[in-house]
Amino acid sequence: MTATAASKYGGFASVFISVDQIYYGACEPTETVITASVQDTQNVTNMVAFFRLVDKVTLKATDWNPAISMQDKGGGTFTLNLRATDILDYKKYNDVWVSYQLVGANKRGDPIARTQIVTNSITLMACP
């Protein structure tokens, strides 16, 4: 499990990634679990994740996916099982980074916690 330093994130205590490389095709693992904990446990009531792919050579990025809701585990902790098939255009690449940003909101839907855009902590590869 890898952790990203909490100081990089506005309103986040921690962000953990269960595995840093996922595959599409017959190889395992095909998903990673993202677990995020917020500092403001009383007011952050929902969280969404945005994803795009970044080519490791050219650094060109795809468009962002529509927001994917994360599961509220209680106590300011949210999780998402991210599968390769959840990301737009995943089959167009053999070896790319999955770039992501997490956004936590209050009951009115106002963003009150947001990570930086994280680019190189998850690799997506075609099954060799």
Residue spans of the language-model regions?
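Glycan-association/targeting regions that enable binding to alpha-glucans and other polysaccharides
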Residues: 1-128
